[in-house]
Design a protein with these regions (language model features):
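Phosphate-backbone binding interfaces of nucleic-acid-interacting proteins
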Residues: 1-160
C-alpha cells in the first residue's frame, strides 16, 4: 500500500520536524513492514495556482486538439497582456494538451524559470502558433504519484 506523507499527516499527528527515516523506524517498531520509501521529485522555481479565464480548443494539422488558454496567475501576470489573447483579459497565454478542465477552474501552473522533475525547464516558447508562457501541470509532471487521473490537477474553488 502506498501512503503519501500528506495523507498520513491528515490522519495522524506527526511533528513537522519528523524525517521520513524516523517515520519509517516508527512503523517498523510498530510491526508495520515498510518495503520502500519513495521521495518526491524536486521542483524548483515559480509554481503557482492560476484560474483559467479562457479555453479555446484548436484542432491541429496532425489531428491533435490543443487548448489555447488564458490563465490568471495574480501577481505573476505579465504587465502587458500578450497580443494574441482576447481583448480585456489579463493573464498568461498557455498551451495545454489536457482536456479535463474548463473556464473557472483553479489549476497548478509552472511559470518560466521553473524546473520540473527530469530537468524539464519551463520557458516561454512558441508552439502551435502561440507563445505559451508557462505550463498547466499534471501530478506526474510535478513528480507526484499518479492517482489514475488523466490530465492536469484541478483544484477546488477555494484554492488560494
Amino acid at each position: 500500500m502506498k501512503a503519501p506523507l500528506s495523507w498520513l499527516r491528515d490522519h495522524v499527528a506527526i511533528p513537522a520536524d519528523t524525517t521520513v527515516d524516523q517515520l519509517k523506524d516508527v512503523f517498523v517498531r510498530a510491526g508495520i513492514e515498510v518495503e520502500a520509501v519513495q521521495e518526491g521529485a524536486e521542483v524548483t522555481g515559480p509554481v503557482v495556482v492560476g484560474k483559467v479565464l479562457y479555453r479555446n480548443p484548436e484542432e491541429q494539422k496532425n489531428g491533435k486538439t490543443i487548448n489555447w488558454c488564458v490563465v490568471d496567475v495574480g501577481s505573476h501576470n505579465p504587465e502587458e497582456a500578450p497580443k494574441d489573447i482576447p481583448e480585456g483579459m489579463h493573464g498568461r497565454g498557455i498551451i495545454c494538451g489536457a482536456h479535463n478542465f474548463d473556464v473557472g477552474d483553479h489549476v497548478v501552473v509552472a511559470l518560466p524559470g521553473a524546473v520540473l522533475p527530469g530537468d524539464f525547464a519551463i520557458s516561454s516558447r512558441k508552439t502551435y502558433g502561440h507563445v505559451s508562457d508557462g505550463m498547466i501541470c499534471s501530478q506526474v509532471e510535478l513528480g507526484l504519484p499518479d492517482d489514475g487521473t488523466d490530465g492536469i490537477i484541478v483544484l477546488g474553488d477555494d484554492a488560494p
